[in-house]
Amino acid sequence: METIILKIILCSGIVLGLYYLFLAKEKTLTFNRFYLLLGLIFSYSIPFVTIETKEIVKNKPVLLIEQEIPQQILQNSTTMQAETFDYTQLLQIIYFVISGILIAKMLYSILKIKTLKGRKIIYQNRNVILLKKEITPFSFLNTIYLSEKYFKDQKIDERIFLHEEIHVKQKHSFDVLLIEVVKAFSWFNPFIYFYKNVMITNHEFLADEEVIIKMKTLKTIRN
């Protein structure tokens, strides 16, 4: 098991390292997104792949020697085994407790979003929740959440709406949910936290890029 954990950490480190070396500064944002998604799957599947090799075993003469093991040695061995603490079991308990806490935290965050109380409207065929309290605009799954101050004269600030609409359209929430689940079960992997930040940053760049393109198109049409 320890070998698999080390392989997972190594693979995710390599995938992330290659991203920083060759893709982080490139404008291939859509490619970057799928590279990170496939890289995540690769990092957590390859370590479980084993290649069996057949070894030719030559028959060698076996010399059998009967020897009686002193009773005192057997008793001492049994006593030592009984007194030895099972650290493996303790580590398993720690692992599942931390994973359980992270899963509970993720579910609580989702529940908190879903129970946000606000005015629901359909704006340009998108579900929008208008909240009285001040929040930074965000989207989750197929819904956009923003403060009422961005909704004036039956219109939402164009740039903000387009930005969040792109997150919804490109289903960025599923990427985030995936990385959160992976993080919950592999919290021991130091690279997974950098991986999450890289994915979210790439989502923001993707949305900004699409907003610029759409705003230019709208400006051309209006002129």
Show where each model-derived region lies.
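A Zn2+-metalloprotease active-site environment signal
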Residues: 170-200
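Short helix/loop segments within enzyme catalytic domains
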Residues: 169-170, 194-223
